[in-house]
Design a protein with these regions (language model features):
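Glycine-rich, proline-tolerant flexible connector loops at the mouths of alpha/beta enzymes
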Residues: 161-178, 272-280
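Alpha-helix-loop-beta-strand connector modules within alpha/beta enzyme cores
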Residues: 174-195, 239, 246, 286-305, ...
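Short, Lys/Arg-rich, polar N-terminal cytosolic tail immediately upstream
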Residues: 1-9
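Hydrophobic faces of well-ordered beta-strands that scaffold small-molecule active sites
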Residues: 132-138, 160-162, 191-197, 217-221, ...
Length: 346
């Protein structure tokens, strides 16, 4: 684990601790005033704990952990249950170590500090486990310097996206070097690798794709490939049953059309840029609204949602999706690992 990764893990812990203290403060204040009004200790304590837990949850979701919108309800339930369990164990601990005679606030502070780290790791492993993932895009051509890219990001990305672009999609595309995928797998042997297949002639790539199937975990096609080449896609799936498939769509794609693909794809990739095939483009703000519409789909938990292109420090936090893909914003920064960890959340 590199130094930047350690720094960010410590940062998560520091903010979690801070928000936990703020949550306890909210709990104490609410309990005090409810007790003044109703003179019911149980109700005041219960209501205070609920308010404190909700505040701590909101603070962590807003500032510390970024998870997809459709998972927020699950995260809230888990966080609340863990918070209530924490209070129950703290009550037992108070009796066990003989601090029942202390005031409520001091009891809570002492017992919370004793079991705090345990519940931090429980929340990280369960409540906030499904955070937004960050992938690095690498083009499958001879222009990409893999050694340079690897030295910049090391193992910090959650996954690698390999962009295979031909001239049927982008007229200035460089010649594809399919062997690049072998080199990428060698450098990131444990990472999830997805192929972003940007071509309007899937048939021309059928043999090459079959050859690299053992190296990849997902292939993302364009909508024309899905509509016109389902037989090829089914053949690929039959050769590698674990292969996941996705479709990439413009942010302007009709909502009903997007729904159609959610029923046959493992992943929907929304392009955050206007023209596919090259990096360094500005982000399309319409992407944010498209993501919000997709988040309302009834089957939202049945597929992954990814945004690819234009991701930078001004917009990543507006996109509560399963996956984000970036290239130039990360690789052109002074500290690429720090930028990756920032996008992974922050």
């Amino acid at each position: 684990m590199n130094l930047e990764n350690i720094k960010f893990k410590v940062r998560f812990l520091k903010f979690y601790t801070l928000f936990g203290l703020f949550g306890l403060t909210v709990e104490f204040i609410v309990r005090y005033f409810v007790l003044l009004i109703f003179s019911n200790d149980f109700f005041a304590t219960f209501f205070g704990i609920i308010c404190g837990v909700l505040f701590a949850y909101w603070s962590n979701i807003k500032f510390n952990f970024q998870i997809p919108s459709y998972r927020l309800k699950r995260a809230l339930i888990l966080f609340s249950l863990i918070g209530i369990l924490s209070k129950f164990l703290q009550s037992l601990l108070s009796s066990a170590i003989g601090i029942d005679e202390f005031g409520y606030e001091l009891q809570r502070l002492l017992t919370s500090s004793l079991i705090f780290i345990v519940f931090y790791f429980i929340n990280v492993q369960f409540t906030f486990a499904n955070r937004t993932q960050l992938g690095i895009a690498i083009y499958a051509n001879n222009n990409e310097d893999l050694e340079n890219i690897y030295s910049k990001v090391l193992d910090s990305p959650d996954f690698i996206q390999v962009d295979l672009v031909d001239k049927t999609v982008y007229k200035n595309a460089l010649e594809v070097n399919i062997s690049k995928i072998n080199s990428i797998r060698e450098r990131w042997p444990e990472k999830f690798i997805e192929i972003h297949l940007m071509t309007n002639d899937l048939l021309a790539w059928e043999i090459d794709i079959q050859n690299i199937l053992p190296l990849v975990d997902m292939i993302i096609f364009n909508k024309h490939s899905y509509e016109n080449n389902l037989q090829i896609i089914k053949k690929l799936k039959s050769k590698k049953p674990s292969l996941e498939t996705g479709v990439y769509l413009d942010s302007s794609t009709n909502t009903e059309e997007i729904k159609k693909y959610t029923k046959i794809c493992d992943q929907i990739t929304i392009m955050g840029i206007e023209n596919i095939g090259y990096s360094g483009q500005n982000f399309l703000e319409s992407t944010i609204e498209t993501v919000k519409k997709i988040d309302k789909f009834e089957n939202r938990n049945k597929f992954k949602l990814e945004v690819d292109g234009g991701i930078d420090s001004t917009n990543y936090h507006k996109l509560r999706v399963d996956k984000l893909v970036s290239a130039s914003s990360v690789l052109n920064s002074e500290n690429s690992i720090k930028k990756v960890l920032e996008f992974k959340k922050l």
